[in-house]
Design a protein with these regions (language model features):
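Outer membrane beta-barrel transmembrane domains
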Residues: 787, 875-979
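Extracellular beta-solenoid/beta-roll
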Residues: 435, 448, 464-466, 471-473, ...
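Residues that define the transmembrane beta-barrel architecture of outer-membrane proteins
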Residues: 458, 593, 599, 741-747, ...
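Structural signature of outer-membrane beta-barrel channels/translocons
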Residues: 490, 514, 719-720, 752-754, ...
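Beta-strand-rich solenoid/repeat architectures in extracellular/passenger domains
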Residues: 1-7, 20-40, 51-71, 81-96, ...
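Solvent-exposed, glycine/polar-rich loop segments of beta-barrel outer-membrane systems
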Residues: 690, 695, 771, 775-777, ...
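Outer membrane beta-barrel translocator domains of Type V secretion systems
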Residues: 679-846, 850, 957-958, 963, ...
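Short secondary-structure subsegments characteristic of cysteine-rich extracellular domains
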Residues: 615-633, 742-758, 873-881
Length: 979
């Protein structure tokens, strides 16, 4: 079927009240064509009251060529009804193009899938245009292409039209660079509802719009079904690009309900909005997870443009609209261009509700002003779940900006990150104006590279009901009458703040910390502090606190390292807490605390004195004023202090009534003075010092005598026959002093060769380990050593034994004091031993004998230098040792050559001095000498047993008495084979 025309070309036409039924069971093609300057072209034209029914799927084609100036209609109805099955509709050419056009009432019904192609108009292109009509579709596909004309729109429903799409909808709209507007869906005083998914792709024109909903004379409604997904992509509007735009011109309501998951992706070179709403009668609802992105692209660097994921703006009555997200949502605004304003969420008197478990907002801009959230003129934002905001920009950047009576309530955990190329203009959270309130009801993490973490002005308020972590060094500031910031107001939150805090010109700042992991590091002015349960304030400059309550907490004035920090308190209360103060008692200078009013209670004073660094000892009478309490109510007591360096320091504090000043006058009851210092090494330092004791003790206790090494060599060996030997032995035991307990295990293997019947020369290697336990630490030593020796036997049962020994210690040290530490150290050791002895038979028949012995061991335990994990530099000087031994062995030997014996030795260390120097990471120093010189006795029991003609077993057990370092017990057991 085909209709051609030079004026009005029509393929199918029904007059007023006419009816026509067409049955195309096998399908049909209906064409309307014009090829000259006719007025209008119609494939189907229905007059008022007419009724057209078409059975079967059809192709409906309407083509205008040759520069026709009339409109081109695929289906035209001026009040008639039409019902179709499936349809492929193509409308091409003409002035204005309409795929489906309806006016003045009437209904379109499509029982099967419909695809509409409308393209190449000189003016407008509409896939579906309805004014007062109803239309029902199944699945609908529209392609509206107007590359040369002015406007293009997929569906335009107005004037009480109702459109229902039972299946899925796909709309593609394109307008050329010279065109005006491109829209996928436009609703004005009408309703469109979709049961399935929506995919809309829009590009080009001055203004590109995914969905535009307007109400003027009647309500306007758009809704999607619960199945599928809404996916809207809009790009390249030269003046503006919008994913969803809603506007109410009067009191008539605009409603947009997205009942399925939604993605709105918008990009353009000028103004770019994912969602934009105008007017208080607008309402937008997202029931499933949503992603809204706005991208300002390169190509237009106008500094007047705006990029926003969501923007709700007020109308002439100063009322904004409402948007609600029932599940998770991610808002992204990126300005590659030089946008003047970039925002994730912009509310101007509107209301935004986020009811999902997660709300994410990301803003990245090359432009001037960037906002994660900007809430103005009485706007309201409620976030029920977690909130994550990341805002980055070039100049003014705000994580949250709240102004002019607006309110934000965040119930979940919040994480806010702000970065600006101009750090002076980066604000994490900002609230200004009376009744401008922000409430964080759960824990908050705040990160900014700028100066301001939180700032309120002119009556603005920010409440952190729980914890706040802000460790970027930015300040927290309440300025102006009725401005207020509360931190951890409900208690129990983790508070970690690095940065100064201020309350000035009528502003108040209430800061609470109530657990041992909470801290503040910064200066303060005019704040109210409540500190409990091990929390710490590390003061970094002169400060004053309007109120300070300390309950088992600490204020540390030493952090700034100045040594003269001033700290003023108007109202002080507390007990069981500490002030930690820098002092130089020798110079009588230090930090100062000034209290106006105080409640009764005891506060402890700990000091970090300069003598810890310069090594001076204060011996003269000194009076250093530390505290002035004008109320004379509080009590202050000195308490020992470990600053994490080398020393524990205990100060003596005295009230001024008990102090005579250097000018001879008596002090006053208001004042408290530091008068004395007592210092001792702290528990962690003791471990470092005592670790050297363990090395020395292990080296000394593994020293040799001939009997220990080779047994009764000169008695069981046939001195008339040359013989070589190989041997091995085990040495183990325990040792200790009043400061430590140690144990060790050593294994030794040796070989010797006979130069003649009375002389042997050999070498040995040994490997072992020791473990040392200290009161507040432990040490593990690994020792690898080697030795060479020579033994000479005389004709009168005497012997001379010379041993040269050398070894290396590898030591692991751990401390478990107030500041646990660990280190690795390495040192070398050397010794030369000369021993002489003679066996004297007492009764040959009984086999009894005695053996006087004398020995000298000269050696050196080398120095070691190391740095602990906490930055303490340790130099452990070497030890020059000279040990002399006089001893006697008394025993009994049987006929086979086996023997048992008792031995007694007296030993003396003639050397044993070493120097120790330490420099802590915090500057504290220590220098001392250690002296291992001592006299002690050893008592032992041993024996030798022949295993055969060329082998024997030997061993002994011994212990020492009388020395500071004692050998609690030691076992020595070996076996030797000769060949």
């Amino acid at each position: 079927m085909q209709g051609n025309g030079y004026y009005d070309g029509i393929a199918v036409a029904l007059g007023t009240n006419a009816a026509l039924d067409l049955n195309f069971d096998k399908g049909a093609t209906i064409k309307a064509h014009q090829n000259s300057a006719a007025d209008d072209l119609f494939a189907v034209n229905l007059a008022a009251g007419s009724d057209l029914k078409v059975k079967g799927d059809i192709d409906l084609i309407s083509t205008a060529v040759g520069g026709g100036t009339g409109n081109n209609y695929g289906i035209y109805s001026a009040g008639g009804d039409a019902a179709f099955d499936g349809m492929r509709l193509q409308v091409t050419g003409g002035k204005n193009i309409y795929g489906v056009y309806g006016s003045s009432g009437g209904t379109f019904t499509f029982n099967k899938d419909v695809s509409i192609i409308a393209e190449q108009a000189q003016g407008y292109v509409y896939g579906v245009y309805l004014s007062g009509n109803n239309a029902d579709f199944k699945n609908l596909v529209i392609n509206a292409n107007n590359a040369e004309g002015s406007d293009a729109c997929g569906i335009f429903a107005k004037s009480n039209s109702v459109v229902q799409i039972a299946g899925d909808t796909e709309i593609t709209v394109n307008v050329g660079d010279s065109g005006y507007d491109s829209r996928a869906v436009r609703i004005k005083d009408a309703e469109i509802s979709l049961a399935g998914s929506l995919q809309a792709v829009v590009s080009g024109g001055q203004t590109a719009l995914g969905i535009l909903i307007e109400s003027d004379a009647e309500n306007a409604v758009f809704s999607t079904g619960a199945t599928g997904m809404t996916d809207i992509s809009v790009k390249n509007g030269s003046d503006g690009s919008y994913g969803l735009a809603v506007e109410s011109f009067d009191t008539k309501k605009v409603t947009a309900d997205f009942n399925n998951a939604a993605r709105i992706d918008v990009s353009g070179a000028m103004d770019v909005f994912g969602i934009k709403g105008w007017g208080g009668a607008t309402e937008i609802n997202f029931k499933e997870n949503s992603l809204i992105t706005a991208l300002g692209t390169e190509g237009n660097n106008s500094t007047s443009s705006t990029v926003s994921a969501i923007s709700l703006e007020k109308d002439a009555a100063n009322v904004g609209g409402t948007i609600t997200f029932n599940k998770n949502v991610l808002l992204q605004a990126t300005a590659v261009n030089k946008a003047q304003i970039s925002s994730g969420l912009n509310i101007d008197n509107g209301v935004a509700a986020f009811k999902g478990a997660f709300t994410g907002i990301t803003v990245k801009s090359n432009g001037e002003n960037s906002y994660g959230i900007i809430n103005n003129n009485g706007g309201k934002a409620d976030v029920e779940g977690a909130l994550v905001v990341d805002a980055q920009g070039q100049d003014y950047v705000f994580g949250i900006n709240n102004a002019n009576g607006s309110k934000i309530d965040i119930k979940g955990v919040a994480a806010i990150t702000v970065n600006s190329a101009n750090t002076e203009n980066a604000y994490g959270i900002y609230s200004t104006g009376a009744n401008s309130d922000i409430a964080f009801n759960s824990d908050t993490i705040l990160t900014t590279n700028g100066l301001a973490a939180v700032q309120v002005e002119a009556g603005g308020k920010v409440l952190f009901a729980r914890g706040l972590v802000s460790e970027s060094g930015a300040y927290i500031f309440a300025y102006g009458s009725d401005s207020n910031i509360k931190i951890n107001s409900e208690g129990g939150g983790l508070v970690k703040v690095l940065g100064d805090i201020f309350a000035q010109d009528g502003g108040t700042l209430d800061f609470k910390m109530d657990n041992s992991e909470s801290y503040l590091e910064g200066a303060a002015d005019g704040v109210n502090m409540d500190m409990q349960n091990g929390s710490v304030w590390r003061v970094t400059g002169d400060s004053n606190s309007q109120k300070l309550n300390l309950e088992n907490a600490a204020v540390d004035l030493t952090t700034d390292g100045v040594g003269t920090t001033k700290f003023a308190i108007t109202d002080y209360s507390g007990t069981g807490s500490n002030f930690i103060m820098d002092t130089d008692l020798a110079a009588e200078t230090g930090d100062k605390v000034n209290i106006t009013n105080a409640a009764a209670g005891t506060t402890y004073i700990q000091v970090k004195d300069a003598s810890l660094v310069n090594g001076h000892t204060v011996t003269d009478a000194k009076n250093l004023l530390l505290i002035t309490d004008a109320s004379q109510s509080a009590n202050f007591v000195g308490k020992n202090f470990n600053a994490g360096g080398l020393w524990d320091v205990t100060p003596t504090l005295e009230n001024g009534e008990n102090v005579t000043l250097t000018n001879g006058l008596q002090g006053t009851k208001n004042d408290w003075y530091l008068t004395k210092l007592a210092k001792q090494v702290n528990n962690d330092t003791k471990v470092l010092l005592e670790s050297g004791d363990g090395n020395y003790a292990l080296w000394r206790n593994t020293g040799d005598t001939l009997r220990k090494r080779l047994g009764d060599l000169h008695n069981y060996r046939d001195t008339k026959v040359e013989s070589d030997g190989i041997w091995s032995r085990y040495i183990g035991g325990k040792f200790g002093s009043g400061n430590f307990d140690g144990s060790f295990n050593m294994y030794q293997l040796g070989y010797d060769k006979a130069a003649n019947a009375k002389s042997i020369y050999g070498f040995a290697v040994e490997n072992g380990s020791g473990h040392t336990s200290y009161s507040y630490g432990s040490g593990k030593d690994k020792l690898f050593a080697g030795s060479i020796y020579g033994t000479w036997h005389g004709d009168n049962s005497s012997y001379t034994d010379v041993v040269a020994r050398f070894g290396q210690f590898d030591t692991d040290i751990r401390s478990y004091g107030d500041y646990p530490d660990k280190a690795k150290a390495k040192s070398h050791a050397y010794s030369l031993s000369v021993e002489y002895g003679k066996t004297i038979e007492l009764n040959k028949a009984q086999g009894t004998f005695i053996e006087p012995q004398a020995q000298v061991i000269i050696g050196r335990l080398g120095s070691s230098s190391y740095t602990t994990d906490r930055g303490n530099n340790v130099y452990m000087g070497g030890v020059n040792s000279c040990i002399g031994r006089l001893g006697v062995v008394a025993g009994k030997k049987d006929a086979s050559g086996n023997d048992v014996y008792l031995k007694v030795n007296m030993l003396h260390e003639f050397g044993g001095n070493r120097d120790v120097r330490m420099l802590a990471g915090n500057g504290e120093t220590l220098s001392e000498s250690q002296d291992y010189g001592d006299t002690w006795f050893e008592l032992g029991l041993g024996g030798n047993m022949k295993l055969g003609n060329s082998s024997h077993l030997y061993g002994d057990i011994e212990r020492s008495f009388g020395a500071d370092i004692q050998k609690k017990w030691q076992v020595n057991a070996g076996v030797r084979f000769e060949f």
